């Protein structure tokens, strides 16, 4: 995204709107999200699934050390696309919110409240000088009292509930795939397969998903627990694609 000299004053200041109603630094934060690895969230009647790709950014990097699906509390998890350091900070914040809620109220935090709390922090960083927006979008999913919940938060602080959502480099292709193939009455197994198929659709023709290049988290309405899938289980589902 490029702007001419007339726009430079609005470009430098985070708190000043341009004449066309834009906050350019927030727009740039959205561009950072589009450069991130693709992550997909799907909600069905049987539960929720988050699937995210992992790539080796450097040849000597230990890919096993890369984490792309995160447990926030027993019933909720998340993934992100964008700046990894920004994602880590917001995930730690979400975990603290969940922990404080358990300590004070002796019950799991609602996913609605958790998402709003994270989105509020993001929004605050769009209206104060001396800071910059978070260059990251989060997919938050889990089970609230046997009800599946799925949200996505944007760098602007906006958050919305979704049936299915994609973020990152392949969001456009994945969204098109999900719009054509999504069904609400999927089993949790079929929801996992749909997420993997949507993620596969974003790859180049000579690429394919492997247990080392994808992370999957899921929660079913039967257990209410958000779990990360093992390599053995990932391999089993990938063989069904």
From Swiss-Prot:
Question: GO cellular component annotations, sorted alphabetically?
Answer: cytoplasm; proteasome core complex, alpha-subunit complex
Tell me, what is one Gene Ontology molecular-function annotation carried by this entry?
A: threonine-type endopeptidase activity
Q: Where in the cell is it found?
A: Cytoplasm
UniProt-listed Pfam families: Proteasome, Proteasome_A_N
Q: Which InterPro entries match?
A: Ntn_hydrolases_N, Proteasome_alpha, Proteasome_alpha-type, Proteasome_asu_arc, Proteasome_asu_N, Proteasome_sua/b
Give the regulation of activity: The formation of the proteasomal ATPase PAN-20S proteasome complex, via the docking of the C-termini of PAN into the intersubunit pockets in the alpha-rings, triggers opening of the gate for substrate entry. Interconversion between the open-gate and close-gate conformations leads to a dynamic regulation of the 20S proteasome proteolysis activity.
Biological process GO terms, please?
A: proteasomal protein catabolic process; ubiquitin-dependent protein catabolic process
User: NCBIfam families from the entry?
Assistant: arc_protsome_A, PRK03996.1
PANTHER family this protein is in?
PROTEASOME SUBUNIT ALPHA/BETA
Assembly state and interactors?
The 20S proteasome core is composed of 14 alpha and 14 beta subunits that assemble into four stacked heptameric rings, resulting in a barrel-shaped structure. The two inner rings, each composed of seven catalytic beta subunits, are sandwiched by two outer rings, each composed of seven alpha subunits. The catalytic chamber with the active sites is on the inside of the barrel. Has a gated structure, the ends of the cylinder being occluded by the N-termini of the alpha-subunits. Is capped at one or both ends by the proteasome regulatory ATPase, PAN.
Q: Briefly, what is this protein's role?
A: Component of the proteasome core, a large protease complex with broad specificity involved in protein degradation.
* Family designation: Belongs to the peptidase T1A family.
The name under which this protein is listed is: Proteasome subunit alpha
Q: Which organism is it from?
A: Saccharolobus islandicus (strain L.S.2.15 / Lassen #1) (Sulfolobus islandicus)
Which gene holds the coding sequence for this protein? psmA
């Amino acid at each position: 995204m490029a702007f001419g000299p007339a726009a430079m004053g609005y470009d430098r200041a985070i708190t000043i709107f341009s004449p066309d109603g834009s906050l350019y630094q927030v727009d740039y934060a959205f561009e950072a999200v589009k450069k991130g690895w693709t992550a997909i969230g799907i909600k069905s009647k049987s539960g929720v699934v988050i699937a995210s790709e992992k790539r080796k950014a450097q040849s000597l990097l230990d890919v096993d050390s890369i984490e792309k699906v995160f447990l926030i509390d027993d019933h909720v998890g998340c993934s992100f696309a964008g700046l990894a350091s920004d994602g880590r900070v917001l995930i730690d914040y979400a975990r603290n919110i969940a922990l404080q809620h358990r300590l004070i109220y002796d019950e799991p935090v609602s996913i609605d409240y958790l998402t709003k709390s994270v989105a509020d922090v993001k929004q605050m960083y769009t209206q104060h000088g001396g800071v910059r927006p978070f260059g990251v979008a989060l997919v938050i999913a889990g089970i609230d009292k046997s009800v599946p919940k799925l949200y996505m938060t944007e760098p602007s602080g906006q958050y919305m509930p979704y049936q299915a959502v994609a973020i990152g480099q392949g969001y456009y292709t994945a969204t098109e795939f999900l719009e054509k193939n999504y069904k609400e009455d999927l089993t949790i197994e079929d929801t996992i397969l749909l997420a993997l198929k949507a993620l596969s659709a974003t790859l180049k023709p000579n690429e394919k998903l492997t247990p080392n290049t994808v992370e999957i988290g899921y929660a079913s309405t039967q257990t209410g627990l958000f779990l990360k899938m093992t390599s053995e289980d990932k391999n089993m589902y990938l063989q069904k694609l």
